[in-house]
Amino acid sequence: MIDDFTGKGTAMIDLDTVSPGLIHLDFGDALRSICNPAGEEETNLAKVVFDEDLATAFCKGYMREAGAFLTDADRAYLYDSIRLLPFELGLRFFQDYLAGNVYFKTSQPEQNLNRARVQFRLCESVEARERSIRSVLKKL
């Protein structure tokens, strides 16, 4: 962002916050954050699970609004987006940990490593529920 008076930069923003993107990225990221009641900071990985009830409720509401403009091709990749986003964020947290925690703010030295583990565990939980998740998506 540029200050109108000084012409100097005042802040950096992610472009995905100001421009349209792939529907799958928004859909997958919404489910990634909504369907992990344990949150990103959980240290007990046994508590990290993909909550199918929350996913079903979100998907029903989402499809009421978005179902009319989603193509068959869009629908075919919805499960993949749910699986991809925690994996991708896990990679980003892990990369940041290896780089010295330069992108994601941390208050503890291994916080991004733990965040990566949480996301990878969430991805595993999604994979374990693939058949059920696909069934829900198919019915919508």
Show where each model-derived region lies:
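Short, conserved loop/turn and helix-capping segments at secondary-structure boundaries
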Residues: T17, G21, E52, E110-L113, ...
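Transmembrane helix-bundle signature of multi-pass membrane transporters/permeases
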Residues: S19, S81-L85
